[in-house]
Amino acid sequence: MLLQVILEGLGLGALLVLVCAVGIRKGAVGMVHLYSPAVQQRCVKLGLTSPERIRRNSLLFKAVCIPGYIGYVLVCVYGINGAKGFVQGFWQLLVILSVMNLMDRLLVDGYWVGHTNAWTIPGTEDLKPYITAKDKQKKWLFGTVGMAVIAAVLAAMMTAFIH
């Protein structure tokens, strides 16, 4: 069961990578809502985007990703794996979300954003690294504590719903 749950986490991580790839398909400015305010302001100043477009893309990203990711993990844990009760649901949700978080931190942030030019926005190179050490600390903290909280909330909701 653990291997299956890890594979489901890899699947969620692959969905994240796919969403990012679609978001930057016409250039990284398409995902500038994920960058610091300084990078966003520079992109607006350079005429690459507008505050309204940044806001719209951010809302669209959240509207697609949050329900999509929640739906995916709930289908995996409760629909496919047949979890019953809080503990079974919680550990599976936590593993899936943690695997996705590791892929996000190491593959997306660490390698793709940090070591390739795919996420470079022309005219903002002087603002690199786009993900600072402080940003990384926050992401790691939220990724560990935050995913545990999300897993607990979803498991509690599903336990109440099922029983």
Feature-to-residue mapping (PLM):
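Hydrophobic alpha-helical membrane-embedded segments
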Residues: I6-G30, I96-W112
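Interfacial segments of alpha-helical transmembrane regions
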Residues: E8, G82-V99
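Interfacial loop at the N-terminal end of multi-pass membrane proteins
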Residues: L15-S58
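Short membrane-interface loop/juxtamembrane segments of multi-pass integral membrane proteins
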Residues: Q40-I54, T120-K139
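Core segments of transmembrane alpha-helices
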Residues: S58-Y78, K139-V153
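C-terminal halves and exits of single transmembrane alpha-helices
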Residues: L97-D109, I131-I150
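Juxtamembrane non-transmembrane "cap" segments at the membrane-aqueous interface
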Residues: R105-E125
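Juxtamembrane boundary at the C-terminal end of a transmembrane helix
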Residues: L154-H163
